[in-house]
């Protein structure tokens, strides 16, 4: 998949010097937005807590909630479960599928559970759970969350001509425009839907928005990051970030 020319033409062309400056190693106290699917896995909660307790290092402008969902695994999980539990033939057409889901299926069998017993949050449910969990972390640290926490996209991008205008995407835009002469570090530890929507709505923020994204890292964690969950949830958003 490539990004259409009419989309890319909306973005300012940054010089090499500007790009290198934006990507240079930061020093001092920097303005940051944390973009997180906090209710998905415990690492986001640690990241948020560390950020909130690092006021000497980070000027936290706000926290934006991301959607998350494992629904894209559902069909393959059911297929692998059927193959394994019914002793169906394993050949070159399904070997990789079985390998990828073997431990997951085996865990279900040992627990006497069926894939039907697993509930897969929708992206809409995921973003709301993340929003509430962000507030929960603020409260546990006795830090006021008013004006600091924003709901994000309730779904993933379906095309690049219809960005999702949300509290989160607007907040990202507002902060980049408010501080045009400063780098705004948007640290994303989930999918890129909020960030991509902000870019599509206001392409000029590319000038001072620096995205730091956790995705595609080497891992021995079975299955979940095989193809980078943060990347594959919203392929349109991920592709835009690489090409714009």
How would you name each of these model-derived features?
Residues 1-244:
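N-terminal acidic, glycine/proline-rich low-complexity segments
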């Amino acid at each position: 998949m490539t990004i259409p020319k009419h989309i890319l033409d909306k973005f300012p062309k940054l010089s090499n010097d500007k790009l290198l400056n934006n990507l240079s190693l930061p020093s001092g106290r920097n303005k940051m937005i944390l973009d997180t699917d906090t209710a998905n896995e415990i690492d986001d909660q640690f990241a948020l807590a560390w950020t909130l307790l690092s006021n000497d290092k980070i000027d936290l402008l706000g926290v934006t909630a991301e959607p998350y969902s494992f629904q894209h695994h559902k069909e393959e999980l059911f297929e692998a479960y059927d193959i394994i539990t019914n002793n169906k033939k394993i050949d070159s057409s399904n070997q990789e599928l079985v390998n990828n889901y073997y431990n997951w299926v085996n865990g279900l069998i040992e627990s006497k559970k069926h894939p039907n017993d697993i509930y897969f949050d929708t992206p809409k449910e995921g973003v709301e759970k993340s929003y509430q969990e962000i507030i929960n972390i603020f409260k546990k640290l006795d830090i006021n969350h008013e004006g600091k926490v924003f709901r994000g996209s309730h779904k993933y991008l379906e095309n690049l001509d219809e960005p999702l205008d949300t509290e989160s995407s607007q907040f990202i835009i507002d902060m980049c425009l408010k501080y045009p002469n400063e780098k705004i570090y948007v640290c994303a530890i989930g999918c890129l839907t909020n960030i991509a929507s902000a870019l599509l709505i206001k392409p000029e923020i590319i000038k001072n928005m620096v995205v730091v994204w956790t995705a595609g890292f080497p891992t021995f964690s079975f299955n979940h990051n095989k193809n980078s969950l943060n990347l594959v949830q919203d392929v349109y958003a991920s592709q835009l970030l690489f090409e714009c």
